[in-house]
């Protein structure tokens, strides 16, 4: 009896550290959010805006750490290889759902290798054309492009980015043939749109805001009009019903993060995105706050993986 009791106590003592670790308070040190893009962009804006509020709610610093490069894979890999302790998260974009269709070196599975936390926001892209393009609206542009198959050009930021997918979907639904001109940065693409060297570019809100006098916005890629420029119609209402290809962002961590950590961070994100000052700043920047449950985020990624797969198949894309 004594031997059995001693063995039970020994087992309990061994198990206690693990049990304690599973229920330990979180966070008890700063939390980092990896942004797989350079400072100063839309990704950076969202995390830096939210960080002070998350710190107030959860009692620890939330630090934005920019890790750009290799189309986002440097930052993504860093998070994948981080311990699932709740102190490293990724600002994940919707484009991750389509990465495997264009990049043969992508080894991760979004649904298997990441822990979903919360959806954050939706940001439309604006279809910008040079004023010399003789099309005042989307229907006129489609008619123009159909009359010149293979001659119209459009700027993208390389295979796999949302403007790339937005253009492929647009060309397919509009039944037009156009030439993709890839650029390394938004700035370079914008210069060529402003000069008329390319015909159109799906650009973020900030690009249109800074160049309204020099370009024409004929449509936005989201299902609803932007709060920033509500006068610009959606592609869907301009003749291509069902079109919807905005940028969207979420927070994810490496696979295996404790459920209570996910629940705490998810609740803090929802509260932050509901704060009037946060909502106002995001809306003014053309970003629509849209929190979610982890389950809703998983469902959205699954749906977009299928969407990108269909677009890739129709376009004949092969991973490079």
State each model region's role.
Residues 28-30, 173-176, 259-320:
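An extracytoplasmic/periplasmic, membrane-proximal ligand-sensing/linker region
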Residues 122, 206-274, 303-306:
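C-terminal lobe and pocket-closing loops
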Residues 28, 55-59, 174, 227, ...:
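A short C-terminal helix-loop "cap" of Rossmann-like NAD(P)-dependent dehydrogenase/epimerase domains
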Residues 81-87, 101-188, 235, 248-281:
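Hinge/capping helix and adjacent helix->loop/strand transition within the periplasmic-binding protein
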Residues 66, 91, 116-119, 156, ...:
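Structural signal for conserved beta-strand scaffold positions within catalytic alpha/beta enzyme cores
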Residues 1-28, 320:
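Short, low-complexity disordered leader/linker segments with a strong preference
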């Amino acid at each position: 009896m004594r031997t059995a009791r001693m063995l039970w106590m020994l087992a309990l003592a061994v198990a206690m550290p693990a049990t304690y670790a599973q229920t330990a308070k979180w966070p008890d040190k700063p939390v980092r959010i990896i942004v797989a893009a350079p400072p100063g962009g839309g990704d950076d804006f969202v995390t830096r805006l939210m960080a002070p509020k998350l710190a107030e709610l959860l009692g620890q610093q939330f630090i934005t750490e920019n890790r750009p490069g290799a189309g986002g894979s440097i930052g993504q890999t860093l998070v994948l290889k981080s311990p699932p302790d709740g102190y490293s998260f990724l600002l994940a974009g919707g484009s991750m759902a389509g990465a495997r269709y264009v990049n043969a070196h992508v080894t991760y599975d979004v649904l298997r290798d990441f822990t979903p936390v919360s959806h954050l926001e939706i940001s439309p892209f604006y279809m910008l054309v040079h004023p010399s393009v003789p099309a005042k609206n989307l229907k006129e542009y489609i008619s123009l492009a159909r009359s010149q198959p293979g001659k119209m050009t459009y700027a993208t930021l390389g295979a796999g980015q949302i403007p790339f997918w937005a253009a492929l979907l647009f060309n397919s639904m509009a039944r037009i043939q156009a030439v993709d001109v890839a650029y390394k940065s938004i700035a370079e693409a914008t210069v060529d749109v402003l000069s008329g060297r390319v015909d159109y570019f799906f650009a973020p809100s900030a690009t249109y805001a800074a160049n309204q006098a020099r370009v024409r916005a004929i449509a936005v890629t989201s299902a609803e009009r932007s709060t920033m420029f509500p006068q610009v119609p959606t592609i869907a209402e301009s003749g291509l019903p069902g079109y919807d290809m905005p940028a969207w962002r979420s927070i994810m961590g490496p696979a295996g993060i404790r459920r209570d950590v996910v629940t705490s961070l998810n609740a803090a994100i929802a509260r932050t995105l509901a704060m009037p000052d946060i909502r106002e700043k995001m809306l003014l920047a053309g970003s629509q706050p849209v929190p979610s449950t982890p389950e809703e985020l998983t469902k959205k990624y699954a749906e977009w993986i299928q969407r990108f797969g269909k677009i890739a198949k129709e376009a004949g894309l092969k991973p490079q």
